[in-house]
From Swiss-Prot:
Mg(2+) binds at D222. This is Uncharacterized PIN and TRAM-domain containing protein TTHA0540. It comes from Thermus thermophilus (strain ATCC 27634 / DSM 579 / HB8). GO terms for cellular component: membrane. Part of a toxin-antitoxin (TA) system. An RNase. Its main location: membrane.
Amino acid sequence: MKTRHLVYLAFALLGLGLAGLLEDWGLLPQSPSLLSLNRLYLALAGLLTGLLLGPRLEGALEARLKRLRSLPPEVVVATTLGSTIGLLLAVLLTTLLAQVPGFSPVHSLLLALGLVALFVYLALGYRAYFRLPEPKPAPRGGKVLDTSVLVDGRVAEVAAVGFLEGPLWVPHFVLKELQHFADSQDPLRRAKGRRGLETLERLREAAPLEVLETTPKGESVDEKLLFLARDLEAALVTNDHALLQMARIYGVKALSIQALAQALRPQLQVGDTLKLLILKEGKEPHQGVGYLEDGSMVVVDGGSRYRGQEIEVVVTQAIQTQVGRLFFARPAQGAQ
């Protein structure tokens, strides 16, 4: 109902109330047919008055209603409770005092107003006790962890040194997937599941960790992770390359522990010396090939005769390719 309609209704009711007062004071004819007609006329008069004054009163009434809606909940509760107690007590006292000579409706009205004012004043003094419990804010920010990063396990060390700020969220469907892996008959899947659960235990000791029971929309686990991270305004931590690409499409911030590890790996420079296991021969004559811990290939000139041996080599050249860095080296002096 619009505010203007409330004004019309209020003035119509005022007209009916005025008719009742005039009847009680004997200022209207007491004929039943005329009483009904006079009530109708006064109600219509009130309605017409409302139509005339409504546009002017609407703005002021809207401002008052807006102010009432902005009142703290504890003030509304205290005022309502105080008014109710005051009115109930006024009804009781009016019933008891009705037989007292000289006690009129005016006295009853004044008594009611006084009691309501008194109990509202008292209730507002204790409004802190009527304060409603504030709803727990929905979690925001932090990091959402997926299955791949838990199975990897390095996220626990990263969190332990403080590189993952904010709360860590593990969706219940990710935990369920880890449990399914841990109960698998496949030894490899079972080992992954148990490693993921062990990572969770270490994470609880390193950072605030909470299992989210929320089930976001989406059919696949990847879609649920993306929607959940977006709803929480959180970053998604994953080692899944396809999921990282989907996160960019969905506009979700994504972090990769694998990318962090690659960024922090020591960078070999020309002239550096290292021990390298020669695994196979290279494409060119007398070349041997070995690999660093991060998978980078090292081609050793004159290293073919050391196949199957770990020797000391000196880096002679480093090339950046699309798939990573490629190093060239030669056996150090004294290599056997």
